[in-house]
């Protein structure tokens, strides 16, 4: 014979289908909230003079304190929310760029940095250059300049974060 207290304890931890669905919805909301609060970026250099790379890395230094926006640099595409791309896209690097983009989890965003990343820059009419990042992957934000200042790069990423917040 079971008592009321034993019955309550036994049934308290049984999973119900609606509990599981609620948990999935809550986890989805939690993941979205975390991405908005702390976007992780992946820096992808497709080639060129490296001027934009220096400015992107300068933007990540303590002087500019991008961590106040939650921005963190990650080494793996599987951990990144935003790809920050620099340099013109060549035929040789296009397949690698596409593969790395596909490895990023949804939702994923791309920021093209510099004249080369946006349009191909001075290399755009050469035989081996496809042009900017938008020829291979969808680009959400363009940050022109040769090279753009760290403040402009930070501003572009922050605008993307605001755009993401507005859409959710």
Predicted regions and their residues:
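Glycine-rich, charge-decorated loop segments at or immediately adjacent to ligand/cofactor-binding or catalytic sites
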Residues: 118-134
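A short, gly/pro- and small-residue-rich
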Residues: 96-111
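Hydrophobic cores of alpha-helical transmembrane segments in multi-pass integral membrane proteins
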Residues: 82, 112-113, 117-118
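Metallocofactor- and cofactor-centric catalytic cores in central/energy metabolism, strongly enriched
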Residues: 73, 85, 90-93, 102, ...
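Iron-sulfur (Fe-S) cluster-binding modules
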Residues: 1-51, 56-68, 72-77, 106-108, ...
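Short His-Asn-centered micro-motif
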Residues: 85-87, 113, 145
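Short glycine-/acidic-enriched loop or helix-start segments at secondary-structure transitions
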Residues: 94-96, 121-123, 153-154
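Short, basic, glycine/proline-bearing loop/turn elements
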Residues: 57-58, 80-87
């Amino acid at each position: 014979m079971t008592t009321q207290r034993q019955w309550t304890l036994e049934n308290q931890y049984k999973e119900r289908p609606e509990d599981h669905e609620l948990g999935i919805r809550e986890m989805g909301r939690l993941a979205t909230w975390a991405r908005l609060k702390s976007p992780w970026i992946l820096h992808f250099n497709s080639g060129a003079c490296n001027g934009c790379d220096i400015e992107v890395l300068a933007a990540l230094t303590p002087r500019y304190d991008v961590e106040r926006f939650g921005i963190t640099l990650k080494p793996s595409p599987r951990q990144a929310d935003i790809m920050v791309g620099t340099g013109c896209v060549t035929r040789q690097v296009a397949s690698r760029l596409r593969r790395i983009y596909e490895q990023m989890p949804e939702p994923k965003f791309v920021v093209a940095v510099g004249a080369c990343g946006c349009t191909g820059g001075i290399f755009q009419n050469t035989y081996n250059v496809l042009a900017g990042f938008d020829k291979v992957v969808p680009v959400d934000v363009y940050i022109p300049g040769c090279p753009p200042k760290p403040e402009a790069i930070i501003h572009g990423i922050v605008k993307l974060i605001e755009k993401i917040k507005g859409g959710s």
